[in-house]
């Protein structure tokens, strides 16, 4: 049930993910018209869910799919046949069921926070939405780490297509759903109907195509679906967690097709964009937080938008629960464990290893006294990344680089910032390395 999956994903940004995994993911959702039955294995879980989560579950299920009633029950979901696309008995797309293609209307271009790291991707998605099927951006491939806004832009483009032309048939699927639908069609001997469903839409949006790696039959079917849509000038928008040519297990001919249109990277947001995202998400929730709190979260959380949103949700939830004002002190206290975990994830040794591997060096090369250009530039870049991604002081960073003086670190940071304005290759290296830390 698609709306239940989206509900769980949203809840993981509002509550501790381990709590969602423990108490909510074991539930089995069964939709009956405008009602949903959530089956739990025992009374204890039902009582806990009812006390802690039921109100929010009702809100989200109503938002995602118009569900009016949510019921908790002990047992297991009955076996049912799930249709991914509304079809009639002839295999044509049903004209009696409003076609929304699993689009989440919450995501649009207005609530997407634009920054240097994503402005090209936003512009590309907007163009695809305005001129679907145009060969300059068909297919449109958005790639980058988790939680950087790829799916947001995909939904936003699909929603604009539907706004411009309400009869436009836009289908959004995660790659796992495409795979599951194909497996069901093989089992039911209904592959012809499966193919017609996808060939008769106006735009196809598929998330996380790296999931296709190693699945030969799935790639075969997607290859033919891609060709049919492309030849018919229907828009294709895809996302991937990395540049497709770097995905092992994707067939060369599929990689070639993906390169026909426009491929755009989304990088981790810089500090200013992170702060703007926190403030925008707070406004969406109707919460008011001081700028300095947004700056605190932006400075401490570097990896992706989901982490920023998770920190904000934790902060707002505790403020509402305790009735306390959101101050710097309150924020540091509330987010202490979360921020500590973030810092432990990205440490200077980790940065040194990733930079050394990226340039084909050894860590001892970065720490050596040699000043050849092939070593000096990666060393400076590693120092600048340590300044950007950790809370270590300049002297501490210098100590980690074989006892270098803090002025050396400061010079490296300034030099990298200056050179990135003119050297495209260095800027690309910086962006690629930042993406590695968001994975």
Curated annotation (Swiss-Prot):
Alphabetically list the UniProt keywords: ATP-binding, Cytoplasm, DNA replication, DNA-binding, Lipid-binding, Nucleotide-binding
The question of whether Nucleotide-binding is a record keyword is answered with yes
Q: Which GO terms describe its biological process?
A: DNA replication initiation; regulation of DNA replication
Ranges for the region named Domain II are 75-101
Region named Domain III, AAA+ region: 102-319
> What's in the GO CC field?
cytoplasm; plasma membrane
Q: Where in the cell is it found?
A: Cytoplasm
InterPro entries reported in the protein's UniProt record? AAA+_ATPase, Chromosome_initiator_DnaA, Chromosome_initiator_DnaA-like, Chromosome_initiator_DnaA_CS, DnaA_C, DnaA_dom, DnaA_N_dom, DnaA_N_sf
Q: Tell whether Transit peptide is among the UniProt keywords.
A: no
Q: Which SUPFAM superfamilies match?
A: P-loop containing nucleoside triphosphate hydrolases, TrpR-like
The UniProt similarity line reads: Belongs to the DnaA family.
Quote the subunit structure annotation. Oligomerizes as a right-handed, spiral filament on DNA at oriC.
Q: Which NCBIfam families does the entry mention? A: DnaA (TIGR00362)
**Task of the protein:** Plays an essential role in the initiation and regulation of chromosomal replication. ATP-DnaA binds to the origin of replication (oriC) to initiate formation of the DNA replication initiation complex once per cell cycle. Binds the DnaA box (a 9 base pair repeat at the origin) and separates the double-stranded (ds)DNA. Forms a right-handed helical filament on oriC DNA; dsDNA binds to the exterior of the filament while single-stranded (ss)DNA is stabiized in the filament's interior.
What this protein is called in its record is Chromosomal replication initiator protein DnaA
* The encoding gene: dnaA
């Amino acid at each position: 049930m698609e709306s239940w999956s989206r509900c769980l994903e949203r809840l993981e940004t509002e509550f501790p993910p381990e709590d969602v995994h423990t108490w909510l993911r074991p539930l089995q959702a069964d939709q009956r018209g405008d009602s949903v039955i959530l089956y739990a294995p025992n009374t204890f879980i039902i009582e806990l869910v009812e006390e802690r989560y039921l109100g929010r579950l009702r809100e989200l299920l109503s938002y995602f799919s118009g569900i009016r009633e949510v019921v908790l029950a002990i047992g297991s979901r009955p076996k049912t046949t799930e249709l991914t696309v509304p079809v009639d008995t002839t295999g044509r797309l049903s004209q009696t069921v409003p076609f929304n293609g699993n689009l989440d209307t919450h995501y649009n271009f207005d609530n997407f926070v634009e920054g240097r790291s994503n402005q090209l991707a936003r512009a590309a998605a907007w163009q695809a939405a305005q001129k679907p099927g145009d060969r300059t951006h068909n297919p449109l491939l958005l790639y980058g780490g988790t939680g950087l806004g790829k799916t947001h832009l995909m939904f936003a483009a699909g929603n604009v297509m539907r706004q411009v032309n309400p009869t436009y048939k836009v289908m959004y699927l995660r790659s796992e759903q495409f795979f599951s639908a194909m497996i069901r069609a093989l089992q039911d001997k209904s592959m012809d109907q499966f193919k017609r469903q996808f060939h008769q839409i106006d735009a196809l949006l598929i998330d996380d195509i790296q999931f296709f790696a190693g699945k030969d039959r799935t790639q075969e079917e997607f290859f033919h679906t891609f060709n049919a849509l492309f030849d018919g000038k229907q828009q294709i928008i895809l996302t991937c967690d990395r540049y497709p040519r770097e995905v092992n297990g994707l067939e060369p001919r599929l990689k070639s097709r993906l390169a026909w249109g426009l491929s755009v990277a989304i990088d981790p947001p810089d500090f200013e964009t992170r702060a703007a995202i926190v403030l925008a998400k707070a406004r969406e929730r109707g919460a008011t937080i001081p700028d300095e709190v947004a700056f605190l979260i932006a400075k401490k959380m570097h990896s992706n938008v989901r982490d920023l949103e998770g920190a904000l949700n934790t902060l707002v939830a505790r403020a509402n629960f305790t009735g306390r004002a959101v101050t710097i002190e309150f924020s540091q206290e509330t987010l202490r464990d979360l921020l500590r975990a973030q810092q432990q994830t990205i440490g200077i040794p980790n940065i040194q290893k990733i930079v050394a591997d990226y340039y084909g060096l050894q860590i001892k090369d970065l720490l050596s006294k040699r000043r050849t250009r092939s070593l000096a530039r990666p060393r400076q870049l590693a120092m600048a990344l340590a300044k950007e991604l950790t809370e270590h002081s300049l002297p501490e960073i210098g100590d980690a680089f074989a006892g270098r003086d803090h002025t050396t670190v400061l010079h490296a940071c300034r030099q990298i910032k200056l050179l990135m304005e003119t050297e495209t290759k260095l800027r690309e290296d910086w962006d690629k390395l930042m993406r590695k830390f968001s994975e």
